[in-house]
């Protein structure tokens, strides 16, 4: 289980599903152990869809130094996790037809079941089991026209990520 301790003092607990996406879970846990997510904020907020984090630059273009293989149907992996509310999935470069192995450190959390259109094209690998109210508060932070938060606040800043 992963815990995001937000700068606001709130927490988000996420259960991982290595039986569906073992390489993705292994990579995510490694990044947590290394402190990679500490001090990073949720840089993209799309109300009714997703909140996205894991980019050390905060621009949507950064990541870790290592890409991982896509663990989803379009990449040849039978991942049965559906992108429903609370599901954790890897963001990646590319589209529905290319860039399958470009996931690195950026991730998103689904805000509702409208994310099911992503099934088979993005590696879902966990689910929020406690703190969905925190996720929903993050989703309500004001954004600009590019879905970026207008300012980095304690509500969207991950103070520390840990394995619990």
Predicted regions, residues:
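Cyclophilin-like peptidyl-prolyl cis-trans isomerases
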Residues: 1-164
């Amino acid at each position: 289980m992963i815990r995001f301790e937000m700068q606001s003092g709130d927490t988000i607990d996420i259960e991982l599903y290595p039986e569906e996406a073992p390489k993705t879970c292994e990579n995510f846990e490694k990044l947590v152990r290394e402190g990679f997510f500490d001090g990073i904020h949720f840089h993209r907020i799309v109300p009714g869809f997703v909140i996205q984090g894991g980019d050390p630059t905060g621009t949507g273009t950064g990541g870790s130094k290592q890409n991982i293989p896509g663990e989803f149907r379009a990449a040849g992996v039978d991942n049965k996790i559906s992108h429903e509310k609370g599901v954790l999935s890897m963001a990646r470069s590319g589209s529905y037809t290319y860039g399958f192995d470009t996931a690195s450190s950026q991730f998103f959390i689904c805000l509702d079941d409208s994310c099911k259109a992503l099934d088979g094209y993005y590696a879902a690998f966990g689910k929020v089991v406690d703190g969905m109210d925190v996720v929903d508060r993050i989703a309500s932070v004001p954004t600009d026209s590019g879905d970026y938060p207008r300012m980095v606040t304690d509500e969207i800043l991950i103070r520390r990520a840990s394995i619990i």
